[in-house]
């Protein structure tokens, strides 16, 4: 995971005719994530997709036309090819760094990383970031994100204006959890993050649909439905105990059942559905602080 620059991008202002990017890529094997990991660079202006250009294996240069507009422009990378940007040059006009926006730490699993989205820019956190003017730090860990204490400590140590937590499906399989173990881990995770960010809104999203796991016990006897119930119960308990800046979003019905090509990860449309449901909640949490107003 550390070798894949999930969510790394370049945001800039200005109206150049184009930008040129000198780059180096390490691999053409996109692994289990597949084509959605990206084989191209692409520029967005605000939330409008602009020109894309294929990346080569090894060293190369790509030129991309940049559409005009007042919104920040964003260059997304071919993440799965493990790119390094060597240089970026504007043509036909100057560019400058985009203004700072509220910093959002988005912790989750491969769903947050963007698996089965059409491209890295199509992962639901990046759609939300563009639409809600947030500076997202994508902490999506494929095959992991089981509420590890080390991750909670890292989140607690980083500057943030908003934090989100969305994990659970990998606690049904891979490293199976019972409902009680999952609940204890989530509570510890939330306590550590809250200690580091006493006033920052935290949006907790319980596991989204996974048809094969909903009613099927894992090795410790827990169905995904049991883990989801435990997730929501822990968040509600923390709210009742005085965490007034903790938000709960039940995840079960956020994505339609036919939007999971591999049974686990939402497709491109499913990521749009997640962004549509979660974007306003994240914005509201940032602006209002407390779900109780």
Task: State the predicted function of each range.
Residues 1-104, 279, 283-293:
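N-terminal secretory targeting modules
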Residues 6, 107, 139, 167, ...:
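Short glycine-rich loop/turn motifs that provide flexible caps or phosphate-binding loops at active sites
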Residues 57-66, 80-85, 115-128, 158-172, ...:
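Short, charge-rich amphipathic segments
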Residues 9, 116, 262:
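Conserved aromatic-histidine-acidic binding/catalytic patches
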Residues 3, 13-16, 149-293:
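Alpha-helical cap/lid subdomain in secreted, periplasmic
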Residues 74-159:
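Serine-esterase "nucleophile elbow" of acetyl-processing enzymes
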Residues 25-27, 110, 142, 169, ...:
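Residue-level signal for short, function-critical loop segments
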Residues 21, 107-108, 205:
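Short hydrophobic segments within beta-strands
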């Amino acid at each position: 995971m550390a070798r894949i620059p999930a969510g790394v991008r370049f945001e800039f202002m200005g109206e150049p005719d184009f930008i040129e990017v000198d780059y180096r890529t390490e691999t053409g094997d996109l692994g289990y994530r597949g084509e959605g990991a990206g084989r191209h660079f692409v520029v967005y202006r605000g939330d409008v997709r602009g020109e894309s250009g294929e990346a080569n294996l090894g060293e190369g240069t790509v030129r991309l036309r940049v559409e005009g507009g007042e919104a920040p422009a964003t260059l997304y990378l071919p993440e799965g090819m493990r790119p390094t940007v060597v240089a970026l040059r504007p043509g036909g006009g100057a560019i400058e760094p985009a203004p700072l926006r509220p910093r959002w730490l988005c912790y989750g699993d491969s769903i947050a990383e963007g698996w089965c989205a059409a491209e890295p820019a199509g992962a639901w956190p990046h759609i939300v970031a563009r639409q809600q003017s947030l500076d997202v730090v994508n902490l999506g860990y494929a095959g992991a994100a089981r509420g590890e204490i080390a991750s909670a400590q890292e989140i607690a140590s980083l500057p943030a204006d908003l934090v989100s937590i969305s994990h659970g499906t990998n606690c049904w399989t891979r490293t199976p959890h019972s409902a009680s173990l999952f609940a204890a881990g989530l509570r510890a995770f939330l306590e550590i993050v809250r200690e580091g960010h006493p006033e920052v809104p935290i949006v907790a999203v319980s596991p989204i649909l996974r048809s094969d796991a909903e009613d099927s016990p894992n090795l410790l006897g827990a169905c995904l439905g049991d883990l989801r119930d435990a997730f929501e119960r822990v968040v509600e308990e923390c709210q009742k105990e005085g965490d007034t800046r903790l938000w709960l979003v039940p995840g079960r019905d956020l994505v339609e059942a036919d939007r999971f090509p591999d049974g686990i990860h939402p497709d491109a449309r499913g990521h749009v559905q997640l962004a549509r449901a979660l974007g306003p909640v994240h914005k509201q949490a940032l602006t209002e602080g407390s779900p109780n107003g």
